[in-house]
């Protein structure tokens, strides 16, 4: 089971134009700061936040309880000129979890309802003994094939084409995908196999002539899974595996490191 928290700024659209439209540069900076602060706050508890549309964010929050969510919510109220609402849900797949959380939040009223403030609810249950699977996907040799050859905007356009293709393909497996900068994407993907990813990569390569690779991490929290995914991706880059996917599981990884005589102090 994966635990997802949907985060939404309360009544944000009307606030941006009241009493007059606010400077766009200020709004962009404010949204970026909120994303950064939320990642730091949830990250302190081994969670991970993705910005989606900036006024609506999705966080992977396995291991994070309701009290911690409440404290984060209060901290945002104290730091920002607006409030946020949060709903937590769990499911076998990321898409199912975020959908359930979203539907529960919508039951409290519109995102632009001035009377709906600081909703905090659990749609079904908090995850006690679940896991997180995250794939860190990137484009093979984007520097040599795009960055150093075509314009900055054309590279950006191609990256977004790949992003959309990945989002549509992964949705067939009830997985999610988020852009995380450069040519990198992260996909919460509980239940997917390496073969599923290879099939998707082959279809995208046939259509766009772009090769992809992915480290896949499976851990108890978003931080554990994403760290393992990063290590798996480095194994592919270092040609330590013979295919474009590499899966690392938390317990297996810790056992292999301990067996090499290294001392680890995992925080579970």
Swiss-Prot record:
MF terms in GO: GTP binding; GTP cyclohydrolase IIa activity
UniProt keyword Magnesium present: yes
Cofactor(s) the protein requires to work: Mg(2+)
A Pfam family matched in the record: GCH_III
Superkingdom of source: Archaea
Claim: Transmembrane is one of the keywords in the record: no
Reactions listed under catalytic activity: GTP + 3 H2O = 2-amino-5-formylamino-6-(5-phospho-D-ribosylamino)pyrimidin-4(3H)-one + 2 phosphate + 2 H(+)
InterPro entries (UniProt xref): GTP_CycHdrlase_3, Nucleotide_cyclase, Rev_trsase/Diguanyl_cyclase
Biological role: Catalyzes the formation of 2-amino-5-formylamino-6-ribofuranosylamino-4(3H)-pyrimidinone ribonucleotide monophosphate and inorganic phosphate from GTP. Also has an independent pyrophosphate phosphohydrolase activity.
Record's subunit section: Homotrimer.
Note in the entry: This enzyme couples pyrophosphate hydrolysis to the guanine ring-opening reaction. GTP cyclohydrolase and pyrophosphate phosphoydrolase activities probably occur at independent sites.
PANTHER family: GTP CYCLOHYDROLASE III (PTHR42202:SF1)
Family: Belongs to the archaeal-type GTP cyclohydrolase family.
The protein's name: GTP cyclohydrolase III
Organism annotation: Methanocaldococcus jannaschii (strain ATCC 43067 / DSM 2661 / JAL-1 / JCM 10045 / NBRC 100440)
């Amino acid at each position: 089971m994966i635990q997802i928290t949907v985060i939404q700024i309360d009544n944000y659209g009307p606030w941006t134009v009241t009493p007059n439209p606010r400077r766009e540069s200020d709004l962009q900076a404010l949204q970026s700061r909120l994303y950064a602060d939320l990642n730091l706050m949830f990250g302190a508890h081994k969670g991970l936040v993705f910005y989606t549309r900036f006024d609506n964010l999705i966080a992977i929050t396995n291991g994070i309880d309701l009290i911690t969510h409440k404290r984060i919510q209060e901290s945002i109220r104290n730091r920002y000129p607006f409030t946020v609402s949060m709903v937590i849900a769990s499911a076998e797949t990321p898409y199912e979890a975020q959908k359930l959380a979203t539907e529960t939040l919508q039951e409290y009223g519109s995102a632009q309802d001035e009377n709906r403030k600081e909703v905090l609810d659990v749609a079904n249950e908090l995850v006690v003994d679940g896991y997180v699977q995250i794939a860190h996907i990137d484009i093979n040799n984007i520097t040599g094939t795009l960055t150093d050859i075509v314009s900055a905007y054309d590279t950006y356009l191609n990256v977004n084409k790949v992003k959309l293709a990945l989002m549509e393909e992964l949705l067939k497996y009830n997985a999610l995908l988020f852009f995380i900068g450069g040519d990198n994407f992260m996909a919460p993907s509980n239940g997917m196999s390496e073969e599923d990813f290879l099939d998707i990569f082959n279809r995208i390569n046939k259509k766009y002539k772009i090769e992809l690779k992915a480290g896949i991490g499976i851990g108890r929290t978003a931080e554990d899974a994403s760290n393992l995914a990063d290590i798996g991706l480095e194994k592919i880059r270092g040609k330590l595996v013979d295919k474009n996917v590499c899966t690392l599981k938390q317990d297996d990884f810790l056992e292999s490191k301990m067996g090499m005589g290294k001392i680890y102090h995992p925080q579970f």
